[in-house]
Amino acid sequence: MKEMVGGCCVCADENGWTDNPLIYCDGENCEVAVHQGCYGIQEVPEGEWFCAKCTKASAMMPGSINEATFCCQLCPFDYGALKKTDRNGWAHVICALYIPEVRFGNVHSMEPVILNDVPTDKFNKLCYICNEERPNDAKKGACMSCNKSTCKRSFHVTCAQRKGLLCEEGAISRNVKYCGYCENHLKKAINDPAIKVIPACPPVQRLSKEQDKKKTVLLTSLPLPPPAPRLHMLADPLPIKSNKVNNVLGLGSAINAVSLEERPASGSTVNSGIFVPPPTAFSPPLTTSSRSSVAQDPSPPLTINKNSLSSSGPLIPSTAHLSATTASATPIMANGSTLPPSSETTVGTHCLQQLQIQSAAAAAITQNQIGPSELNGYPAASQLSSFMHEIPARNTTSVASLLPPGAAEYHLNGSGDEEKTVKAVLTAPLTKAKRIRDSKNDMMDKTHKRPRANARPPAVLGSMSSGSSGGTVGKSPSMQRLQNLVAPIVSETVTDFQRDRVADRTAAERRAAAAQSQPSTSTNGGPNVTIPAVVEVHTNSTNSTNHQNNGLTQNAPASTSMQAGTSSNDGVISQNGTSSTSQSNRLNLPSFMEQLLERQWDQGSSLLMANAHFDVAQLLSCLFQLKSENFRLEENLSGLRKRRDHLFALNSRLAEVNTLDVSKRQRSDGLLLQQQIAHHLDPTSIVPKAEVHKQEPLSAPTSVPLPANHSSSLFEDIKAPKATYSRKTPSNIPLTVPLSTAATALTTTTAASSGAPVNSNIQNHRATPSTAGAPMAATPIMTAVTSANELAALSPERAQALLNMYRMPLDANVAAQLSMITNFPGQVNPSLFSRLLAVNMMNGGLQPNGQPLSALPPPTSATPNGK
């Protein structure tokens, strides 16, 4: 039969789930237990499953296997979950995970393990753990460093796993960092909520079949210590029946030699004289996987006769002759009644059961005139209540405090297998705060998968002293080894918040229980048997089990009514199985609204933690963080939206201001141009000419464009005579003035001017700054201004009115010409002004204010009219 001890070799978790079962290797002397995801198992087989090491070993010759065959290349050990490497060797999966440079060739099957990227200096480091315990193995394999930046210590991954130094950073997120701390800096990881400390996972090795067949454990009793006044534990009291001493179950005795053999077949009898507890009391609470399941062994009912009690034994008055038979899977009492089965039994539960059984036996012996002093230090029934209602501040319970007070200490003499057996028994988790699977799923797993019987050999738990100083330990080396084995017991801790709620709830329940003074009576006529009343927050068995698993079971003060048989605080169970729950219901009903709310809160949280396949508390913490982050992002988004609207409004205001500035700048530029023209066309700088002599040009006649819808009689061609003119200051006309304006100014004459011809050369200099020297197109003003006399006769008032009327739509050159007319007072005649006013009725002429100038018609040739 296969003995399943411990959890996963990689993650040290003892739970299995439907999508990630915990699988045990079926190889000979192999204790490998891994999760499907932790070991990279592609498909879980229906039959037997073998790890990679056992699969390889089965194909090798028996004599070719030695200690170095399967030794890990990253540590000095050859046990555990191993995988093939790229160097044709072996390496632990846990070593590959915690050394960053190691990777897997296939991440799904997690093999082979690639070691080429591991730096050489990691193989040269010294493991400080091995250096203290096994100096020869200190330099073997590769070491990981302490995650503390200033720490220089290094150690093997498997050594850190045995010491409980491995951690996972960022366990709440998907990016998990596998790291480890030395013993000096481990406190940092324990205090950091973002770091998950992996519990210690000591290796469990089996002996060979020859050594495992038959073993002997020698137990020698020592002087008994005084009974402890209190016992701190978190397990529920097991209901028992205390009518007669013959019905007492489990009253054991001490022996000198115990023969530990394999479990006899069904129906056989073991006459050993040793107290044999039910195997389920020693079974670690392993959650069965979808493939691997544990078939519960039949628990042998134990009986003891009243006549066998005497004063000769070291533990009890006489050596009780016990008959243990494997007849039923449920513990059966002598009177035919059955004990309620427990879905999960721990070391603490077993010890409390034994305490109750022995106390009940003491009460029965007291009723039969046997003094309590004959029980060799065991408490009487009147002292039992002090053990029942004590709720500890923590669920961290040592083995010494779990064992019955007054029990003898034993020296363990024998082979190493007994040490491993006791170690496997005592290192089982005391209470489970994690989720477990219900019994229905376990039964379904058992029907689909190959059953495995729990064949752990029975053993007797020796007690360590529970005094204030920790108790005395035996001087033998075996007892010292036993103490070292049970020292690293891992017990999960209840949070401060839960402990406060437990204390408040317990006080409220005690007050409610004390308020009830009327005892309950059974309505059935049959004989009634009493059990200790347990006032719990949860009234049904499922919630009670969940509270036991979470370490939050509440026990009310039990009375000392075991001697009398009835009590005011006892729940009554009738013979036909029905219960009178009126008193218990009244005790469980909350008296205040706060109690009701706390009860609903506890029931909901226990239900979630018991049935959910994930860490509910951690998930709630993640949801709260997500909600806070979402709220922060919403506030940030609202602020950004307000900022965007503000910038849009500011941009629109700036655009309006920019448009106004452009218009003002254009107007200022026009005024500046007018001032420049007025400055350059000062009339004092122009010398009057005698007469303009018209002369035919030597080249082809100049073509002047005319509007298409007006008569040529209103306009005259401007001809360029060849005659030269004389000036006192030839350089008075600057080049910045438009040439057309300069030509017009040169044709201006007075009545007293001489008759000398003037060479204006208008045709070759008619240009604008925009055309860069090209001949300037004729405008209505230029064609209308054909006589210098008419231009000079235009009054300044009329020229200013004409300029104001046509300023906005005029071209820059036209505006310059009108400005020039304004600057010659008394030299423009009224007839020219009248002609200019008539031009706005023609196509291509001047337009009213606010309308752009229309395009001019194509130029046409014009002949001189002789004027």
UniProtKB/Swiss-Prot annotation:
Free-text tissue specificity from the UniProt record: Isoform a: Expressed at high levels in maturing oocytes, but at low levels in the rest of the germ line (at protein level). Isoform a: Not expressed in the pharynx, germ line and tail. Isoform c: Not expressed in the germ line (at protein level). Isoform c: Uniformly expressed.
Keywords of this entry: Chromatin regulator, Chromosome, DNA-binding, Metal-binding, Nucleus, Repeat, Transcription, Transcription regulation, Zinc, Zinc-finger
CDD domains: CC_AF10, ePHD_AF10_like, PHD_AF10_AF17
UniProt cross-references to Pfam families, sorted A to Z: PHD_2, zf-HC5HC2H_2
Swiss-Prot/TrEMBL site (Required for binding to histone H3 methylated at 'Lys-4' in vitro) positions: 4
GO biological-process terms attached to the record: chromatin organization; regulation of transcription by RNA polymerase II; regulatory ncRNA-mediated post-transcriptional gene silencing
Zinc finger (PHD-type) in chain: 5-57, 125-186
Positions of C2HC pre-PHD-type zinc fingers: 69-102
GO cellular component, one term: condensed chromosome
Effect of disrupting the coding gene: RNAi-mediated knockdown results in developmental defects such as slow growth, protruding vulva, and a reduced brood size. RNAi-mediated knockdown results in germ line defects, resulting in no embryos or impaired oogenesis. RNAi-mediated knockdown suppresses the multivulval phenotype of the lin-15A-lin15B n765 mutant. RNAi-mediated knockdown shortens the lifespan of daf-2 e1370 mutants.
Gene Ontology terms for molecular function: chromatin binding; DNA binding; methylated histone binding; zinc ion binding
Region of interest: Disordered: 267-311, 440-477, 503-586, 753-773
Positions with biased composition (Low complexity): 538-550, 574-585
UniProt subcellular location: Nucleus; Chromosome
Region annotation Extended PHD2 domain (ePHD2): where it falls in the sequence: 69-186
Ranges of compositional bias, category Basic and acidic residues: 503-512
PANTHER family (UniProt xref): PHD FINGER PROTEINS (PTHR13793), ZINC FINGER PROTEIN ZFP-1 (PTHR13793:SF155)
Domain commentary: The PHD-type zinc finger 1 most likely mediates nuclear localization. The ePHD2 domain folds as an integrated structural module comprizing the C2HC pre-PHD-type 2 zinc finger and the PHD-type 2 zinc finger. It mediates non-specific binding to dsDNA, but does not bind histones in contrast to many PHD-type zinc fingers.
Function: Recruits the histone methyltransferase dot-1.1 to chromatin to methylate 'Lys-79' of histone H3 and activate transcription. Recognizes and binds histone H3 methylated at 'Lys-4' (H3K4me) at the promoters of target genes. During stress, the zfp-1-dot-1.1 complex also plays a role in the deubiquitination of histone H2B sites, which negatively modulates the RNA polymerase II-induced transcription of highly expressed genes. In response to stress, binds to the pdk-1 promoter to negatively regulate pdk-1 expression, which negatively modulates daf-16/FOXO-mediated gene expression.
Subunit structure: Multimer; in vitro. Interacts (via C-terminus) with dot-1.1 to form a heterodimer known as the zfp-1-dot-1.1 complex or DotCom complex.
UniProt-recorded name of the protein: Zinc finger protein zfp-1
